[in-house]
Amino acid sequence: MAVLSRIMKPYRAFQRLPFELKPLAILIGIAGSTAIFTMGYKIYSDPEIRRSPSWVAQTQQKEETKVKKPQFH
């Protein structure tokens, strides 16, 4: 039950807001979410910031650099 009460806490706080402030709270929430997603996208897409190769490139590089062990018959 503790998890459910944590999840419901922001909703209950929103319910207690006066009716006049609810549109402002919604607008602030949407703007904050948009800012977070935009920054995440910019950080992920900028090659200067994101220098590590992708998972696919790492896997391909490992396959190419594997040293084959000699097989003795």
UniProtKB/Swiss-Prot annotation:
One of its GO terms (biological process) is mitochondrial cytochrome c oxidase assembly. It is a single-pass membrane protein. The chain crosses the membrane at residues 21-43. GO terms for cellular component: membrane; mitochondrion. The keyword Protein biosynthesis does not apply. Pfam families: B12D. Keywords: Membrane, Transmembrane, Transmembrane helix. It is found in: Membrane. InterPro entries: B12D. Residues 54-73 are annotated as: Disordered. This is Uncharacterized protein PB8E5.10.
